[in-house]
């Protein structure tokens, strides 16, 4: 096995270890965001991306913690989050053209709101996941 001392020589704290373990999932999320941004229907792409991200956050609370964290310990995590934000920005721009997202909503807002939805789903019953995702999407719409 690997001793605690060996782990802490490579990772200064638990969050750094969790970031390293979450890198592959974060890469998958970036890839999904890029695919959603190039979808024929941007709104469908956004819904698919949010569902994909929410499922992974619910499956892996450590991954959710990495997405929720404002401070990254590793450059790889910061780079992947920046890449994710760029892809989500492109996706939001496409959805804005359909009139389905407020002009003031940014990629970081979507990530923070999704983290809130994940927390709410974990706190309640899993049966509310689709309802909360629908509420999030409706809340992103411009006021009427």
Name what the model sees in each region.
Residues 39-68, 92-94, 98-103, 124-126:
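Helical hydrophobic small-molecule/effector-binding pocket
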Residues 82, 86-101, 116, 123-144:
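C-terminal peripheral helix-coil segments that are non-catalytic and often amphipathic
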Residues 20, 31-59, 73-76, 85:
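Hydrophobic alpha-helical connector segments
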Residues 44-52, 109-113, 131, 135:
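Amphipathic alpha-helical interaction segments
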Residues 28, 32-36, 113-120:
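Solvent-exposed, amphipathic alpha-helical segments
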Residues 2-11:
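Short hydrophobic/aromatic patch on the recognition helix
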Residues 13-18:
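Short amphipathic alpha-helical segment with a characteristic S/N-K-E followed by hydrophobic residues
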